[in-house]
């Protein structure tokens, strides 16, 4: 493993453990040259389906895009990086379990919103406002009213 600080190619593993979701191994490493420590994550690379965009284009499933979208929705909210990673891992597992060769962005977006709604309602509304591309304030208010109604039923 190349040291991110000095570029040296040799290090030693100081600590290894599974991540909370059990989908990756977290390793603390120490560079044998500069002695600085850094963390790496190892995860099994699964074959994920092609994503069919709204305009019909196809592209490879990109976990980083989902992480970025969820993290943006969660900015300045009490949601940790670990919670974002766990949410994205759950969506990724759901996509894998479908066993399809292709999946529409709408399926991925709805899976993200379903989980985000239980994690943080403000982040959910932020994500939904971009994902659903509301045409006007009325559509946005309808979504908020639906959220408030569902929230009232759960209490």
From Swiss-Prot:
Its cofactor is Zn(2+). Keywords: ATP-binding, DNA-binding, Metal-binding, Nucleotide-binding, Repressor, Transcription, Transcription regulation, Zinc, Zinc-finger. Residues 49-139 form the ATP-cone domain. A zinc finger (unnamed) spans 3-34. It holds the Pfam family ATP-cone. It comes from the Bacteria. One of its GO terms (biological process) is negative regulation of DNA-templated transcription. InterPro entries: ATP-cone_dom, NrdR-like_N, RNR_NrdR-like. GO terms for molecular function: ATP binding; DNA binding; zinc ion binding. The keyword Transcription applies. Binds 1 zinc ion. Negatively regulates transcription of bacterial ribonucleotide reductase nrd genes and operons by binding to NrdR-boxes. PANTHER family: TRANSCRIPTIONAL REPRESSOR NRDR (PTHR30455:SF2). Belongs to the NrdR family. This is Transcriptional repressor NrdR. It comes from Anaeromyxobacter sp. (strain K).
């Amino acid at each position: 493993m190349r040291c991110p600080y000095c570029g040296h190619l040799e290090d030693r593993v100081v600590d290894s453990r599974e991540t909370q979701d059990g989908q990756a191994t977290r390793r603390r490493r120490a560079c044998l040259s500069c002695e600085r420590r850094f963390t790496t994550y190892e995860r099994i690379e699964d074959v994920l389906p092609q994503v069919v965009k709204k305009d019909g284009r196809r592209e490879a499933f990109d976990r980083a895009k989902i992480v970025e979208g969820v993290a943006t929705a969660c900015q300045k909210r009490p949601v940790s990086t670990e919670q974002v990673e766990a949410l994205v891992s759950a969506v990724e597992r759901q996509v894998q379990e479908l066993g399809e060769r292709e999946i529409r962005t709408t399926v991925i977006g709805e899976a993200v919103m379903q989980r985000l709604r239980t994690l943080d309602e403000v982040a959910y509304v932020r994500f939904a406002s971009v994902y659903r591309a509301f045409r006007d304030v009325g559509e946005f208010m309808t979504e908020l009213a639906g959220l408030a109604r569902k929230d009232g039923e759960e209490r």
